[in-house]
């Protein structure tokens, strides 16, 4: 289950808020490692570190790091301050954080009786890589709005893993990150997706929320065995809180796997079977035979949801202006334009709901 190694830090490669990327010498040679200073302290060159190297052994893409579990000879100081929410519960790295709605929080009163997000558009996506593309579509038509990212716990648990999130926060493309469930490290911590959406609205003052898992999609190639099934649950959560769910389809023209070409089977299952509340499903007006195939596939969702066709003019240019690199499953903007345009179209539609 876990491959353990002891190593020595030989260099710091780069860092961003909440994370440090390192080169570590182990018995087999050097490996790339990632440390989260809020959990283990900041490793320095020469430090001995304990590593979990399972991801390296598996050859994972997004998560292909050795993970620093401890800096045993230089432990960080004990944390101070309030906080009673335990996340990554009953694991060796379980962490205590301050929940937005717990009694020690300054936001407790605002959230104690909160039961609605007041019609806020909630864009739901399967993959983390859709987040910046959705933002490109939102800001192309509605610059200056406040957008919160509500992170589910189906992928990476620490929000710090996402370099995109760090950059989007620094560029003010996000007014904040809300980490829900077992995920942690956001500007605001929440127990459930429901309290996360309420916090996005009433704590961060978001005009729009984008809900997606963190980096590192999990899937088995079966109908039900993928972490993105939670996107259907997010539609239900948004609806029960009087939000306006906007479903972003996962569409690809560049994926070599047939089940993900056109409208991914992930979207058809999550929105067609799991989402019990109606949503507005955004279908981009893509040209040619591929666009026609996408529209035909998406039509299967019309029995429960409203299909909204959105023009895509100008979205390619908007995507080129993204402050972060666009990549999904190793494919960039030009390698799978349909994927990113589809996500941006969902953002464009959400922006139209604000007027």
Where are these regions (language model features)?
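Extended, charged alpha/beta regions that create polyanion-binding interfaces
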Residues: 1-119, 133, 142-146
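A structural signal for small-residue-enriched, beta-sheet-centric alpha/beta enzyme cores
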Residues: 177-197, 202-203, 209-310, 315-317, ...
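Structural motif
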Residues: 31-34, 47-49, 120-122, 145-149, ...
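Phosphate-binding glycine-rich loops and their immediate beta-loop-alpha structural context
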Residues: 95-190
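Conserved active-site and cofactor/substrate-binding residues in soluble primary-metabolism enzymes
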Residues: 4, 37-44, 125-129, 133, ...
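A cross-family phosphate/adenosyl-ligand binding-site feature
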Residues: 5-13, 155-162, 170-182, 319, ...
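Flexible, glycine/charged-enriched surface loops at secondary-structure junctions
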Residues: 60-61, 144-145, 245-250, 256, ...
